[in-house]
UniProtKB/Swiss-Prot annotation:
Residues 51-163, 242-295, 334-375 are annotated as: Disordered. Involved in plasma membrane dynamics and cell process formation. Isoform 1 and isoform 2 are necessary for axonal and dendritic filopodia induction, for dendritic spine maturation and synapse formation in a palmitoylation-dependent manner. Keywords: Acetylation, Cell membrane, Cell projection, Cell shape, Coiled coil, Lipoprotein, Membrane, Methylation, Palmitate, Phosphoprotein, Prenylation, Synapse. A lipid is attached at residue 380 (S-farnesyl cysteine). This is Paralemmin-1. Residues 285-295 have a biased composition (Low complexity). Residues 109-124, 133-143, 357-367 have a biased composition (Polar residues). Belongs to the paralemmin family. The modification N-acetylmethionine is found at residue 1. GO terms for biological process: adenylate cyclase-inhibiting G protein-coupled receptor signaling pathway; cellular response to electrical stimulus; cytoskeleton organization; negative regulation of dopamine receptor signaling pathway; positive regulation of dendritic spine development; positive regulation of filopodium assembly; protein localization; protein localization to plasma membrane. Interacts with dopamine receptor DRD3.
């Protein structure tokens, strides 16, 4: 009977401990959600105050009614921001007390004070128990879960010694943040090997599986801790950027290969000198051209040259089997010849009298008058 009573009492104590632990976890989760909401609202108020201050700096010195209202609104926002900062500090302390017990504030005070060189520091039992439980949970995390900037983080073992938790990999994410709207945009994401020693940056987030450091832009943007929801959203955006980059690099590979195949299968174009294309022809082939079909070619000639194969040229130009017309002139031997024109064109011959034609003979003066009335043709001859 005593054994049964002891078992019943131990079981009740165990159930009470489990219920108390669940209650603490639920309270911690509630306070964490409230803490994240306060941080988000504080960030919004800071961005709003920065934008309003920038607008007020651009206005002239003469204050108007709208400027006064804006300044009053800025003062109210600053008061709200101070209240949110106090609330955030209080919630963080309450969460520390719930997680590590009543000894957490005392331990933080001891850590803030200068330690004596002769006395080694020993962690409290509640903190050691919590850290050991954190280590077990970190080891049970599946390998496929997304992580970001996971670095070597010291974890205290139950014996009080510091043990390094090895990082599996590290991710470098380049982020651009809009100061007006507060929206975060991921520019690039690169997976690298975990770096040892730790990166030269400021720690802005840490939990059982992830540690986030702000490396660049600290002087411009300031140090702002991140919440778990913001870290998860950042990891999700980084995964989307990585997938989009992989798709953009793998997409154009297939059309390039098809273009190379078409180039190989297309026969070489035959060039015929002296052929002019039609005015309606295009400089490139149609978009739906099939391999093996020769697209139209447009050629523009800025001069001429002698062709070696004259027969082929006549055949192409349609001059084969044509009749050449010759000019036959019958004249008297006494008619003076005029010099040939300089441009090589055929000279205009004066009208002569045929042998069996009857009529008055022409005098030299009449011939000169005829030449003056009828000017000589100096047009160019083609072909």
């Amino acid at each position: 009977m005593e054994v049964l009573a002891t078992d019943t009492a131990s079981q009740q104590e165990r159930l009470q401990a489990i219920a108390e632990k669940r209650r603490k976890q639920a309270e911690i989760e509630s306070k964490r959600r409230q803490l994240e909401d306060d941080r988000r609202q504080l960030q919004y108020l800071k961005s709003k105050a920065l934008r309003e201050r920038w607008l007020l700096e651009g206005t002239p010195s003469s204050a108007s009614e709208g400027d006064e209202d804006m300044r009053k609104q800025m003062q109210e926002d600053e008061q709200k921001a101070r209240g949110l900062e106090e609330s955030i500090t209080r919630l963080e302390k309450e969460i520390d007390v719930l997680e590590f017990g009543e000894s957490a504030p005392a331990a933080s005070k001891e850590n803030s004070a200068a330690p004596s060189p002769g006395r080694p520091q020993s962690a409290s039992p509640a903190k050691e128990e919590q850290k050991s439980e954190t280590l077990v949970n970190a080891q049970q995390t599946p390998l496929g879960t997304p992580k970001e900037n996971r670095t070597s983080t010291p974890v205290r073992s139950p014996g009080g010694s510091t043990m390094m938790k090895a990082a599996m990999y590290s991710v470098e994410i380049t982020v651009e943040k809009d100061k007006v709207t507060g929206e975060t945009r991921v520019l690039s994401s690169t997976t690298v090997l975990p770096r040892d020693p730790l990166p030269q940056g400021v720690k802005v987030y840490e939990d059982e599986t992830k540690v986030v450091h702000a490396v660049d832009g600290i002087a411009e943007n300031g140090i702002q801790p991140l919440s778990s929801s913001e870290v998860d959203e950042l990891i999700h955006k980084a995964d989307e950027v990585t997938l989009s980059e992989a798709g953009s690099t793998a997409g154009p590979a297939e059309p390039r290969g098809l273009a190379e195949d078409v180039t190989r299968t297309t026969p070489s174009r035959r060039e015929i000198t002296g052929v002019e294309a039609q005015p309606g022809e295009a400089t490139s082939g149609p978009p739906g051209i099939q391999p093996g079909q020769e697209p139209p070619v447009t050629m523009v000639f800025m001069g001429y040259q002698n062709v070696e194969d004259e027969a082929e040229t006549k055949k192409v130009l349609g001059l084969q089997d044509t009749i050449k017309a010759e000019l036959v002139v019958i004249e008297d031997a006494a008619t003076p010849r005029e010099p040939a024109p300089l441009n090589g064109s055929a000279a205009e011959l004066p009208a002569t009298k045929e042998e069996n034609q009857t009529g008055p003979t022409t005098t030299p003066s009449d011939t000169q008058d005829l030449d003056m009335k009828k000017p000589r043709c100096r047009c160019c001859s083609v072909m």
